């Protein structure tokens, strides 16, 4: 079964991106993505 991982902006805490993975990663994922609320590229952390 695939797990749903939601990425949350580190600055404004808005939930912007969703990803589905078959396995849960061992470490926390940090991805540099564009945030609509901040209007810039920020770090996004995963939240299970």
Curated annotation (Swiss-Prot):
Keywords: Ribonucleoprotein, Ribosomal protein. The keyword Ribosomal protein applies. GO terms for biological process: translation. It comes from the Bacteria. The keyword RNA-binding does not apply. One of its GO terms (cellular component) is ribonucleoprotein complex. GO terms for molecular function: structural constituent of ribosome. Belongs to the bacterial ribosomal protein bL33 family. This is Large ribosomal subunit protein bL33B. The gene is rpmG2.
């Amino acid at each position: 079964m695939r797990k749903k991982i939601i990425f949350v902006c580190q600055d404004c805490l808005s939930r912007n991106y969703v990803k589905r993975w078959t396995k849960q990663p061992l470490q926390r994922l940090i991805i540099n993505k564009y945030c609509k609320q901040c209007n810039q590229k920020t770090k996004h952390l995963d939240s299970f």
